[in-house]
Each structure stands twice: as structure tokens, then as C-alpha cells.
Amino acid sequence: MVNVLKGVLIECDPAMKQFLLYLDEANALGKKFIIQDIDDTHVFVIAELVNVLQERVGELMDQNAFSLTQK
């Protein structure tokens, strides 16, 4: 029997990949979303969760960014 899943290949740096692996292990999106961990910079994820992943990555980037007015 063949199971077919629609997915998206994501290329990122190793640090971002570790964040994605953390989200996957913690079931932060309600279910596992990584279909295949390919190598150091690539993961294959469920296509329907890509928008949610982009939001989570955006939140992480906002937390790590500093504005010029902050001291």
C-alpha cells in the first residue's frame, strides 16, 4: 500500500532547522509536521502547515530583533 502526502521542501540554515525540529518534537502545531529530515539544511514538511510555520518563524525573528530605539 502506498501513502501519499503533499509536502514542501524547506531549505534553511542549521539553526533554523533545529528550531523546526524542536517545534515538531514538541507538537507545537498540534501534530508532527516534518515528513522527512533530509540533511543539515533541508526538511520535507506537510504542505498544509507551511503558513503556520512561517508565522512561528516570524514570531521567533521578531523576538530576536532589536529596534534602534531600544537600549
Curated annotation (Swiss-Prot):
Subunit structure: Component of the 7-subunit TFIIH core complex composed of XPB/ERCC3, XPD/ERCC2, GTF2H1, GTF2H2, GTF2H3, GTF2H4 and GTF2H5, which is active in NER. The core complex associates with the 3-subunit CDK-activating kinase (CAK) module composed of CCNH/cyclin H, CDK7 and MNAT1 to form the 10-subunit holoenzyme (holo-TFIIH) active in transcription.
Function: Component of the general transcription and DNA repair factor IIH (TFIIH) core complex, which is involved in general and transcription-coupled nucleotide excision repair (NER) of damaged DNA and, when complexed to CAK, in RNA transcription by RNA polymerase II. In NER, TFIIH acts by opening DNA around the lesion to allow the excision of the damaged oligonucleotide and its replacement by a new DNA fragment. In transcription, TFIIH has an essential role in transcription initiation.
Compartments it resides in: Nucleus; Cytoplasm
Origin species: Mus musculus
InterPro entries according to UniProt: TFB5-like_sf, TFIIH_TTDA/Tfb5
Name of this chain's protein: General transcription factor IIH subunit 5
Residues with PTM Phosphothreonine: T69
One GO cellular component term noted in the UniProt record for this chain: nucleolus
Family note: Belongs to the TFB5 family.
Top-rank taxon: Eukaryota
Entry-linked Gene3D superfamilies: TFB5-like
BP term (GO), one: transcription initiation at RNA polymerase II promoter
Alphabetized SUPFAM superfamilies for the sequence: TFB5-like (SSF142897)
Pfam families linked to this entry: Tfb5
Record key words, sorted: Cytoplasm, DNA damage, DNA repair, Host-virus interaction, Nucleus, Phosphoprotein, Transcription, Transcription regulation
